[in-house]
Amino acid sequence: MRGVSVLESSGDTGVGAACLDQDGKTPQFNPVFPATCPYVTAVGGTVDLAPEIAWSGSSGGFSNYFKAPWYQKAAVQHYLNTYVSAETKEYYGQYVNFTGRGFPDVAALSVHPE
């Protein structure tokens, strides 16, 4: 480690940048690299101040290539078990790798910061 921090936008195309896998035929959310890399701090976007909410153009989700790092597993599992219904997980399971590295790591005001 060199002590260099790498921060990267989580993406500006919504949840998955595209809905086709690399073969161009299989429907699958396709999150953008390098935000999905566990060695990068992915920064998502928010909008409004009272209350501050996620910006719909920002991206987030789970990597199709990188497994969830050890420090995310408990928090992601808690989120999925508490806030995502079994029906939702079953339906979206064909499009999302729920065991992949979750992103973004942090979020900041992105739309009309004044």
Residue ranges and their predicted role:
Residues 1-114:
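Extracellular protease catalytic domains of secreted zymogens
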